[in-house]
């Protein structure tokens, strides 16, 4: 019973940390609880993707404009998550684009103000996502599943960096979840991330996973070269990049 309670609290911890959804006061907050919650991060992707799909479907029932429905669904996910991962993308873009040493990059990334590189990166990411999803609109069911799959699998791939990379900044919101991830937690996160992809067939899911493994390896090497490891912002940037790659791959698969 205690083990079940711990998992339940870990799930609620993940919900409270990565969304704006209020969680029961009894959940509390602890470093150990947040680390245990890592395996459930892809399930937050299920939740965010399901909200996006529901909003898209509802808007499309009222306005026959697929681009508008996609835009509103994206806005709903930004409200739900507080643009948590987009903020990480912006911070990384500013730091990597404007810093000349690892120390400079970390200092810029820690600055809450957004710069030109960050603004451009977020705008490009949102535009690409809007265009990719809009292109999926003819696939009425496929686009709904793609929303869930992209949010889930991208979070699984991003959090897997905690399995192999060291955290390089002592302060910051994501520090408590920056301990090395256990293999058992990584396995569960991987399962939660891959399951929605299987709707498109095992071959498609396998190709997406192979692409994510390659992209994760390249991005991890980039982080190490630029700042010597990872930060919470790096995980946000990784999630955004992986989400775009997944949508790109799914669109190519559905269009073939």
Curated annotation (Swiss-Prot):
Family per similarity comment: Belongs to the CobS family.
GO molecular function (one): cobalamin 5'-phosphate synthase activity
GO cellular component: plasma membrane
Protein name according to UniProt: Adenosylcobinamide-GDP ribazoletransferase
InterPro entries for the chain: CobS
GO BP terms, alphabetized: cobalamin biosynthetic process
Enzyme class: transferase
Gene name as annotated: cobS
């Amino acid at each position: 019973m205690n083990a079940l309670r711990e998992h339940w609290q870990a799930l609620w911890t993940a919900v409270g940390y990565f969304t704006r959804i209020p969680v029961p006061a009894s959940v509390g907050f602890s470093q150990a609880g947040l680390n245990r919650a890592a395996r459930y991060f892809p399930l937050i992707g299920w939740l965010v993707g399901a909200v996006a799909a529901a909003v898209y479907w509802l808007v499309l029932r009222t306005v026959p404009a697929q681009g508008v429905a996609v835009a509103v669904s994206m806005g709903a996910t930004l409200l739900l998550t507080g643009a948590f991962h987009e903020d990480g993308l912006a911070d990384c873009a500013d730091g990597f684009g404007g810093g000349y040493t690892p120390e400079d990059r970390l200092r810029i990334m820690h600055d809450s103000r957004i710069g030109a590189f960050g603004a451009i990166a977020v705008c490009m990411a949102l535009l690409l996502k809007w265009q990719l999803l809009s292109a999926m609109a003819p696939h009425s069911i496929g686009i709904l599943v793609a929303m869930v799959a992209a949010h889930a699998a991208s979070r699984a791939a991003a959090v897997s960096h905690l399995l192999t990379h060291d955290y390089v900044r002592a302060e910051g919101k994501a520090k408590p979840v920056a301990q090395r991830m256990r293999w058992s937690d990584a396995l569960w996160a991987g399962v939660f991330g891959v399951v929605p992809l299987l709707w498109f067939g095992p071959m498609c899911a396998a190709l997406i996973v192979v692409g994510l493994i390659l992209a994760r390896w390249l991005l991890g090497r980039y982080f190490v070269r630029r700042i010597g490891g990872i930060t919470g912002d790096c995980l946000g940037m990784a999630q955004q990049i992986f989400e775009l790659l997944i949508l790109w791959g799914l669109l190519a698969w559905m269009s073939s």
